[in-house]
Amino acid sequence: MSLVHLLLFAGLVIAASSSSPGSRLILREISDQKDKAVELNTTNFDSVLKDTPAKYAVVEFFAHWCPACRNYKPHYEKVARLFNGPDAIHPGIVLMTRVDCAMKTNTKLCDKFSVSHYPMLFWGPPTKFVSGSWEPKKDKSEILVIDDGRTAERLLNWINKQIGSSYGLDDQKFKNEHALSNLTDYNQISQAVYDVEEATAEAFDIILAHKAIKSSETSASFIRFIQLLAAHHLSRRCRKGAAEILVNYDDLCPSGNCSYEKSGGNDTLGNFPICGKDVPRGYYMFCRGSKNDTRGFSCGLWVLMHSLSVRIEDGESHFAFTTICDFVNNFFMCDECRLHFNDMCLSVKTPFKKARDFVLWVWSTHNKVNERLLKDEASLGTGDPKFPKIIWPPKELCPLCYLSSNQKSIEWDHEHVYKFLKNYYGPKLVSLYKEKSVSRSKEETVSATEDLTVATNALVVPIGAALAIAIASCAFGALACYWRTQQKNRKPRRR
């Protein structure tokens, strides 16, 4: 083939590629693999904005054929790098998103926001975008047009003015206000609701990855822990996911032999994401450390245990205690941590009769762990320099918790400690859910409020008897009804 023919052939290939919408889409997807801005469309627009933990959202309406949009994209991505994804510098504050109005499927969505030019940027609380719209003549709207964001610097300055921050494009990971924020900030705990979901999903994934349910003992331990989550997890989606695992457990793990691989059906544990398909997200917020290998998962697990402890009733206290002890002993993969925790469990000689006793035991155990790790990390230099282990709670958060203290010991007022823990890991922990629910529809507000609802009498039940815990958890009525229906429908298949 001559050089002329080769050039003609290459030209035809290029022409065909440029004229094919499918080819353009493929090329755009390849080039966007590392994009930080979240691509939204008419299908996922509401769900993504409704579920984001971020307090604010930026939505860019653009057209992929628009030269100005292509030139603006690097500027937008510089800002998105600060806020989006697992490597975000300031995660959980602003969600940066994009909608391609050149795609026919997005036409109605773009029309709802009266998009008059490209690119056009909007700002507001994420929930205000959900099933929302924008009209240029409307005087009062919580959705604002960003009128000064033509460069990355100007866009970030505009955002800084809105939220009273001083973020910079040169901010580096873990060298930021978010990581340096004082743990004594009472309002920080509201972000931990997402970290509890993250830690729950990560713990479940670790069990799947290690195929850790290997005996009747580990199977029983797993079931009891999932029962505890189904009744008392602070996240409704985690409670729902745990309930679905319970209902299907006999089929997923016949005789304790579980199938772990993820497939297209619902016949393996891997196909039941315990906190929903969007969790884990890949990053932590309240539990974010100043180094990649600090805090995170272990911090999230502690918040989970504290949040469970304040949600149980007196009759469940010892069941919750033995369930958590067995779970750590069977499924926590840090061997030294597991052994130390098990020793503290074995030191309890008398069964707990009051929920208060269990709340204080979790708190005391956490402080003992922190004391030990503080010494180890100081000698080895492995601690988090920005978040050193401390005795909890500090005086700044609960001065009444301290009767007296010196460098060697602290005399605690256990009644005030208990009241502090009940509030801090109870109503305070779900405050963000309550705040976000204000702007939602009635149905969504009810769902958000359910995150405050816990069981009042969840008891130990045999393996496979998910119905029993549903009946026992009287305050968890919706879940009980769901379980009863599922178990009733399953009976004919067991004949």
Curated annotation (Swiss-Prot):
GO CC annotation, single: trans-Golgi network
Annotated signal sequence range: 1-15
Gene3D superfamilies: ERV/ALR sulfhydryl oxidase domain (1.20.120.310), Glutaredoxin (3.40.30.10)
Glycosylation site positions: 41, 182, 257, 266, 292
GO function term, MF aspect, one: flavin-dependent sulfhydryl oxidase activity
Domain Thioredoxin: 29-164
Protein name per the record: Sulfhydryl oxidase 2
Gene for this chain: QSOX2
